[in-house]
């Protein structure tokens, strides 16, 4: 029975490259000359620091541009609150990996509502979709690509 997995993953290597490029751009931009502003990655969290809140917002734009250039969807980021004190402003950005249970149920419901001849089951942080024909699976992918979910979805592990 043909099947595929629906996942939401971020390529950590590309994420590291995008952060490095954003740091290089900060070093060369005129409005950030002589300013202690930087991006740091610790696992699935990106910490950004700058002297002011305004500069943090500019850094967000730089990071979004670099991520888009590297093929990483900005929907996979969750921006935390900006913490300010007299010396600097900080913000934590969390990178979302995997599909949460609540969103997986929404995806499964969307497939059911489309009345396709496929079955879906939730396996941890991914969703397996099975159908009798490959055409049914292609229709399911089209439905999921057209749907609006809070995460970017990727399709992998195709089996015949």
Curated annotation (Swiss-Prot):
InterPro entries named among the record's database cross-references: DUF520, UPF0234-like_C, UPF0234_N, YajQ-like_sf
Cellular component, GO, one term: cytosol
Presence of keyword Zinc-finger: no
GO molecular function: nucleotide binding
Keywords: Nucleotide-binding
Gene3D superfamilies registered for this protein in UniProt: 3.30.70.860, YajQ-like, domain 2
Database matches in CDD domains: YajQ_like (cd11740)
NCBIfam families: PRK05412.1
Role, per record: Nucleotide-binding protein.
Family label: Belongs to the YajQ family.
PANTHER family registered for this protein in UniProt: UPF0234 PROTEIN YAJQ
Protein's name in the database: Nucleotide-binding protein Smal_3487
Species annotation: Stenotrophomonas maltophilia (strain R551-3)
């Amino acid at each position: 029975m043909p099947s595929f997995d629906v996942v939401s993953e971020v390529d950590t290597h590309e994420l590291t490259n995008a952060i490095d490029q954003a740091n290089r751009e900060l070093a060369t931009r005129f409005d950030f000359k002589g300013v202690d502003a930087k991006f740091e990655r610790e696992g699935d969290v990106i910490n950004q620091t700058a002297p002011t809140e305004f500069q943090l917002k500019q850094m967000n734009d730089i990071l979004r541009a670099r991520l888009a250039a590297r093929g990483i969807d900005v929907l996979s980021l969750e921006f935390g609150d900006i913490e300010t004190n007299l010396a600097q402003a900080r913000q934590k950005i969390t990178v979302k990996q995997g599909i949460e249970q609540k969103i997986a149920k929404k995806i499964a419901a969307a497939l059911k509502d489309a009345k396709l001849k496929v079955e879906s089951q939730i396996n941890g942080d991914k969703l397996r979709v099975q159908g009798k024909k490959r055409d049914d699976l292609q229709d399911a992918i089209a439905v999921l690509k057209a749907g609006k979910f809070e995460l970017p979805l990727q399709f992998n592990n195709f089996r015949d």
